[in-house]
UniProtKB/Swiss-Prot annotation:
Keyword Amino-acid biosynthesis: no
Transmembrane feature ranges: 3-23, 34-54, 61-81
Keyword hit for Transmembrane helix: yes
Full protein name: UPF0316 protein Clos_0555
UniProt subcellular location: Cell membrane
Organism of derivation: Alkaliphilus oremlandii (strain OhILAs)
Keywords: Cell membrane, Membrane, Transmembrane, Transmembrane helix
Membrane topology: Multi-pass membrane protein
Chief location bin: membrane
CC terms in the record's Gene Ontology section: plasma membrane
Domain of life: Bacteria
CDD domains, per the entry: YitT_C_like_1
Family of this protein: Belongs to the UPF0316 family.
Length: 172
């Protein structure tokens, strides 16, 4: 029973510290220094406990298996958590040629700020709709665009910072 608890401790510690590492890296990229440092402190403390447990029992391959399994699962869980947290801002480009004025009106009625640029694609004139938004509202953008134009081309890029312009909250 004690050995089983040891494996579980190693697994959970690795799962936790690797998940935290994923979130910490996102905070670093977004310029959130203090949050990243605090997460890093807790993360490395947990890591030291896990590696200490493994190194004290290197003759037991199940310790290594628990460590590796926790690492792999931690990567998965970290990415899952990051997606659910949906931190930060993004810039979406919606390219369409179908009743663009109506699409722009729908997007603005939902609460998005939209800038329209005329472009020329392979098959003629297209309109590029630039939309800056919080990541947590991306599914609402997709839904609104999909309801209007199933063939619209949408690209999304991360925005480290947004300053000025129309950046309102979503309407219910």
């Amino acid at each position: 029973m004690e050995a089983l608890l040891g494996y579980l401790l190693i697994f959970v510690a690795r799962l936790t510290d690797v998940s935290m590492a994923t979130i910490r890296m996102i905070m670093v990229v977004k310029g959130k220094r203090v949050i990243a440092a605090c997460i890093g402190f807790v993360e490395v403390s947990i890591y030291v406990v896990a590696i200490g447990k493994v190194l004290s029992g290197m003759d037991n391959p199940l310790n290594v298996l628990a460590y590796a399994s926790g690492f792999a699962t931690g990567n998965y869980v970290g990415i899952f958590l990051e997606e659910k947290m949906a931190l930060g801002n993004i810039i979406a480009q919606v390219i369409s040629d179908y009743e663009v004025e109506k699409l722009v009106e729908k997007l603005r009625n939902v609460g998005f700020g939209v800038t329209v640029i005329e472009g020329y694609g392979r098959e003629g004139i297209r309109y590029i709709l630039n939309v800056s938004l919080q990541r947590k509202h991306l599914s609402r953008l997709y839904q609104t665009v999909e309801e209007h134009d199933k063939k619209a081309f949408v690209t999304v890029t991360d925005a480290r910072a947004i300053r000025g312009g129309y950046f309102a909250g979503m309407k219910k």
